């Protein structure tokens, strides 16, 4: 179960701004991404920034939430012609996280990334890793810049599909000046484990700086959501394609 290295991903909230438009976005991104990160809408997306939070809330208000949305995720993956990873909160939702894992496995997801797990349920990390593998998926683990080094080493030893390094404690806010140091430090600790970096990446230049610091891939979410919400789907595609082209040109 491999993902592109170096790689590029776009984050989309499932069913936002509507199911049809969500699938149209995925189709539009065909050829511009290596894989998708698709978030299950939840009423309390605490570890997302204001732009992505709004997409969650609008999807929930329209009646879309929970594991039932993963049929749309599977269809979006097919439209884009790439594999996908599910982003799902382990605690901030009325359904069980076990149910999310089972349904994600049934719908062909590579992995489920729970951003709140290390903060809210740190004692359940090993259970999550084992359950993911039992269901035929690989675990993905979230880390923030303020994570103790021992946690990153713990992650390394669990050998996940990827470690998602957030460059900010919440997505979509200004790229911090210290981000290069954060990525470089994390790389030294996690060794050869695949490291995906996200949050506040808005241009090919941002993406290349993160890769040069040691990340294997980057993900863009808030900037794509802002463009889509203002009716600029073509610009969203252009952004994604330009970032992927820059990454491909750089090579491994």
From Swiss-Prot:
Recorded metabolic or biological pathway in which this protein acts: Amino-acid biosynthesis; L-tryptophan biosynthesis; L-tryptophan from chorismate: step 5/5
Alphabetized Gene3D superfamilies for the sequence: Aldolase class I
UniProt KW keywords: Amino-acid biosynthesis, Aromatic amino acid biosynthesis, Lyase, Tryptophan biosynthesis
Pfam families: Trp_syntA
The keyword rRNA-binding is annotated on this UniProt entry: no
GO terms, molecular function: tryptophan synthase activity
Keyword Chloroplast assigned: no
Record field: catalytic activity: (1S,2R)-1-C-(indol-3-yl)glycerol 3-phosphate + L-serine = D-glyceraldehyde 3-phosphate + L-tryptophan + H2O
Enzyme Commission number(s) from the entry: 4.2.1.20
Active site, renumbered: 37, 48
GO-annotated cellular components: cytosol
Assembly and interaction partners: Tetramer of two alpha and two beta chains.
Function: The alpha subunit is responsible for the aldol cleavage of indoleglycerol phosphate to indole and glyceraldehyde 3-phosphate.
Family statement drawn from the similarity comment of this UniProt entry: Belongs to the TrpA family.
HAMAP family to which the protein is assigned, alphabetical: Trp_synth_alpha
Protein name (database record): Tryptophan synthase alpha chain
Species whose genome carries this gene: Aeropyrum pernix (strain ATCC 700893 / DSM 11879 / JCM 9820 / NBRC 100138 / K1)
Lineage: Archaea, Thermoproteota, Thermoprotei, Desulfurococcales, Desulfurococcaceae
Gene: trpA
